[in-house]
């Protein structure tokens, strides 16, 4: 697909607002290197790749939601109080 149009993407997404939100989340995943693209990069920017994936029907909200679920360790460990010693 040489050029991506909004109409191509709207075949797979309900409206333009959902398209913007979906493309934003997917482009961020691609830009941070957290996820691999489902189409060839072809020297495009992450935003264009995200739109091409949506237009191809390879990415939808279900895919994005699954990718957002992360089972990492918590950012903060449980606080353990240390005794204060008076000087």
From Swiss-Prot:
One Pfam family, short name: RNA_pol_Rpb6
Family in the record: Belongs to the RNA polymerase subunit omega family.
Protein name (Swiss-Prot/TrEMBL): DNA-directed RNA polymerase subunit omega
NCBIfam families per UniProt: rpoZ (TIGR00690)
UniProt key word Nucleotidyltransferase: yes
Protein species of origin: Stutzerimonas stutzeri (strain A1501) (Pseudomonas stutzeri)
Gene: rpoZ
Source domain of life: Bacteria
Subunit field text: The RNAP catalytic core consists of 2 alpha, 1 beta, 1 beta' and 1 omega subunit. When a sigma factor is associated with the core the holoenzyme is formed, which can initiate transcription.
Keyword Cell membrane: no
Listed transmembrane segments: none
InterPro entries the record matches: DNA-dir_RNA_pol_omega, Pol_omega/Rpo6/RPB6, RPB6/omega-like_sf
GO MF assignments: DNA binding; DNA-directed RNA polymerase activity
Alphabetized PANTHER family for the sequence: DNA-DIRECTED RNA POLYMERASE SUBUNIT OMEGA
Reaction catalyzed: RNA(n) + a ribonucleoside 5'-triphosphate = RNA(n+1) + diphosphate
One Gene Ontology term from the biological process aspect of the record: DNA-templated transcription
GO cellular component entries: DNA-directed RNA polymerase complex
Keywords annotated in UniProt: DNA-directed RNA polymerase, Nucleotidyltransferase, Transcription, Transferase
Protein function: Promotes RNA polymerase assembly. Latches the N- and C-terminal regions of the beta' subunit thereby facilitating its interaction with the beta and alpha subunits.
HAMAP family named among the record's database cross-references: RNApol_bact_RpoZ
EC numbers on record: 2.7.7.6
